[in-house]
A protein has these predicted regions:
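Pre-Walker A (pre-P-loop) alpha-helix and adjacent loop at the N terminus of AAA/AAA+ ATPase modules
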Residues: 9-56
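Conserved alpha-helical scaffold flanking the Walker A/P-loop in AAA+ ATPase domains
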Residues: 37-40, 93-113
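Walker A/P-loop
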Residues: 42-79
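Walker B catalytic acidic pair
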Residues: 52, 115-116, 127
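P-loop (Walker A) phosphate-binding loop of NTP-binding proteins
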Residues: 53, 87, 155
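Canonical AAA+ ATPase core
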Residues: 94-99, 116, 120-124, 132-223, ...
């Protein structure tokens, strides 16, 4: 398809983005990067891991987005005594009909917020992650498809690590993006304080539908990506595994494991969605750089030496982007 045709198509299908941002902005002050990353997840079918201290409007943001997109929202608070059946559902006996009937769990929603995912044991985490991967769950002996669109946003608190069950690397890899949610600016905090103490109850109205998101998804897949951009993505991911081959020998002692092929796939998809949100029908290297850290930060596993020298995965990824040749 011609790039001009794709551009026109993207312009038409991405018209809801500004309306959505304005509607969410009625409730949420700031956090534009987090909102954009969640939208990228929605447009690509990739799940999102949010890391940040309590009170940064993570839950409220997801709830507001679901209202603005007319989607079903469910929040699951993960605790040590949670069971897989509490998430996916179970079968109950109907005495009137003398049969077992399925009782669907909170996973049957469009937007699912798994709050403090690292507070539940591994069997509960794996039940959720299986649903994320397969987009279906088995209750009793019947398999049920999950609704579309389906997006899981999991949160974890970076401070309190006592009594938590850290997500293994294999499960972290299933999240398309890992977002570090930061504090608001001074001006934003003043606006938050004024808004929350004014006594006004503001909520978001629906400005888009799940059908529009489904249509936008098909357009995102058509966003043009040049061969050189594809090679650039592969070079970035390859540099996490073989830094010496890219003239980054000093990083070899700091990287224990590089990113998996999922990183290349997700960089490709996320870059297309990033371009779509800017009403562009083609991907530029800036799109790759903009979402690169969020795609790679949980996939580059550092050595103890890196931790001892207080070198973070973000530092390593930035060095990779500085040294790998831009097309």
């Amino acid at each position: 398809m011609d790039v001009r045709v794709i551009n026109e198509l993207v312009h038409k299908q991405s018209a809801f983005v500004e309306k959505l941002s304005a509607e969410v902005g009625k409730v949420i002050v700031g956090q534009k990067a987090m909102i954009e990353r969640i939208l990228i997840g929605l447009l690509t079918g990739g799940h999102v891991l949010l890391e940040g201290v309590p009170g940064l409007a993570k839950t409220l943001t997801v709830k507001t987005l679901s209202d603005a997109l007319h989607m079903r929202f469910q929040r699951i608070q993960f605790t040590p005594d949670l069971l897989p059946a509490d998430i996916v559902g179970t079968v109950i006996y109907n005495q009137a009909k003398s049969e077992f009937i399925p009782k669907k769990g909170p996973i049957f929603a469009n937007l699912v917020l798994a709050d403090e995912i690292n507070r539940a044991p591994a069997k509960v985490q794996s039940a959720l992650l299986e649903a994320m991967q397969e987009r279906q769950v088995t209750i009793g002996d019947t398999t049920h498809r999950l609704p579309e669109p389906f997006l899981v946003m999991a949160t974890q608190n970076p401070i309190e690590q006592e009594g938590t069950y850290a997500l293994p690397e294999a499960q972290l890899d299933r999240f398309m993006l890992m977002i570090k949610v930061g504090y608001p600016t001074r001006e934003e905090e003043r606006a938050i304080m004024d808004r929350m103490t004014s006594g006004m109850n503001v909520s978001a109205g629906a400005v888009a539908t799940p059908q529009e998101i489904a249509e936008a998804r098909s357009v995102v897949n058509q966003v043009y990506m040049d061969e050189k951009i594809r090679d650039y993505i592969v070079s970035i991911v390859h540099a996490t595994r073989e830094p010496k081959a890219h003239g980054l020998g000093e990083l070899s002692d700091f990287i224990q494991f590089g990113a998996s092929p999922r990183a290349s796939i997700y960089l490709n998809l996320a870059a297309r969605a990033h371009a779509f949100l800017r009403h562009r029908g083609y991907v530029t290297p800036e799109d790759i750089k903009a979402i690169g850290i969020d795609v790679l930060r949980h996939r580059v596993i550092l050595t103890y030496e890196a931790e001892a020298e207080e070198i973070t995965s973000e530092t390593v990824i930035r060095k990779l982007f500085e040294h790998v040749e831009v097309p």
